[in-house]
Amino acid sequence: MEHSHDKSGTIMSKSETEVGSNPSPSNLPWYNRLDVVSVTFLVFLLAVISSIGALEGSGRDLDYLANLSRFLDKFLPPDVSVLDRTLEALLETFQIAVMATFLALGISLPLALGAAHNLAPSWMVALTRMALNVIRTIPSLLWALLTVVIVGSNSLAGVIALTFYSVGYLGKFFSEAFESTDMKITHALRGIGAKPLQALQYGLWPQVKPLIWSHSLWMLEYNVRSASIIGYVGAGGIGMHLALYADSPNSWDKFCTVLLCILVVVTFLDMLGESIRLRIKKRTGGKSAVKV
């Protein structure tokens, strides 16, 4: 064991010297003992305390239970007389979601190639990712408001709005899928004389195809839900009926019918989509789509 001498001549072992020069965490100031988790928790706690004011009522009517009772009296039972037009609007909503997802799929694939570090130069990756981030930052409802102003209150506005919004997410998902691939196959194909598109088709696409379909399916499910909401601002679909019936207390039973139909359709699509994604996951050995 190594020893050292202090000024008084006392012999100290090396381990004792290290302990003396490195104080235990309990002896450190409190701010030096904080880690990232503790700081994050403290910041969140302060944010919660400062947000208590959001729980205050409007002050107009604090009898919330009575309000709920009056609402339920007009909300139930549902008025099935509007079922036919509701189903027609649901079909339009589904068509909006399908067309938006299809267009976004075609736009996102080339953008994702430009956003993948293993496929594009750094400057192109930076520009493409910046564009995708900007597109993704704008909520689908705001995209709908913008498109309604430009093309009017119709289903085309909904298609354009959801296409832009979907491109932001699918471009991100697809680029991550491309970056997760094994490029050795693609490089080998290029080495034996394959053209760039051929190398992508036979070396890259088979690896990412399951994830591409899985992400696209998730986006379709999301767009069906979003298409039900953006119609509220005039972008076509079932949301326009929601807006019409919600504004009239005497039509809340019709609102209930529309809401129940949306619930049934969205639940069915979620179950169907989850089943398909599980099949894709089994075929690809456990890879699954990334959700947000």
Specify the residue positions occupied by each region the protein language model found.
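N-terminal, non-cleaved signal-anchor transmembrane helix
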Residues: 1-102, 114, 122, 280-292
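Short hydrophobic, aromatic-rich alpha-helical segments embedded in or entering the lipid bilayer
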Residues: 63-73, 234-245
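Alpha-helical membrane-interface segments at transmembrane helix boundaries
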Residues: 87-95, 128-135, 221, 243, ...
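Generic alpha-helical transmembrane segments of integral inner-membrane proteins
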Residues: 98, 102, 106-110, 138, ...
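Transmembrane-helix boundary motif in ABC transporter permease subunits
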Residues: 99-132
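Membrane-cytosol interface at the C-terminal ends of specific transmembrane alpha-helices
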Residues: 153-204, 210-219, 271-274
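C-terminal transmembrane helix and the adjacent membrane-cytosol boundary/short C-terminal tail
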Residues: 253-292
